[in-house]
């Protein structure tokens, strides 16, 4: 039996490439915050030893910026609460407006620097 894809389904993210991108975003996060044993949500600065409660979020949308899909600099680490909160607040408006992420993160200078690198 085949199931229909929902109207929001974006197609396969290329499992291996996506997993590699996600891993690289988390490793970059550890280097940027200077903590070798921890990952950090950039909104709340909460340290985590595991990635189970964290998400890698694309700064420039997966849909609209295909050339940046697998660029590890096009990702930030957010806790699940922040990640879901961002998408609840901005829905699809954020797809072509990466600056909405900065707005959501309160325009924090450290966050601006983090995203610019």
Residue ranges of model-derived segments:
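Short, cysteine/histidine-rich loop/knuckle motifs that typically chelate Zn2+
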Residues: 40-45, 81
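Short cysteine/histidine-rich metal-coordination sites, predominantly Zn2+-binding motifs
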Residues: 58-64, 94-104
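Short Fe-S-cluster ligation motifs
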Residues: 75-80, 107-117
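Short, charged surface segments at domain edges that flank catalytic/cofactor-binding sites
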Residues: 2-40, 67-69
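Histidine-centered catalytic micro-motifs used for acid/base chemistry in nuclease
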Residues: 41-43, 52-63
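Short Cys/His-centered divalent metal-binding micro-motifs
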Residues: 75-97
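Short linker/helix segments within small regulatory modules
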Residues: 60-74
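Short, non-ligating residues that shape and space the ligands of small metal-coordination modules
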Residues: 50-54, 88-89
């Amino acid at each position: 039996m085949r199931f229909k894809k929902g109207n929001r389904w974006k197609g396969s993210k290329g499992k291996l490439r996506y997993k590699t991108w996600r891993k690289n975003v988390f490793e970059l996060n550890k280097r940027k915050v200077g903590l070798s044993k921890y990952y950090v949500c950039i909104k709340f600065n909460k340290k985590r030893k595991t990635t189970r409660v964290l998400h890698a979020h694309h700064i420039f949308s997966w849909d609209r910026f295909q050339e940046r899909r697998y660029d590890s600099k096009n990702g930030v680490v957010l806790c699940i609460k922040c990640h879901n909160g961002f998408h609840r607040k901005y829905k699809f408006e954020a797809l072509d407006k990466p600056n909405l992420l900065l707005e959501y993160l309160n325009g924090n200078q450290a966050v601006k620097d983090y995203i610019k690198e």
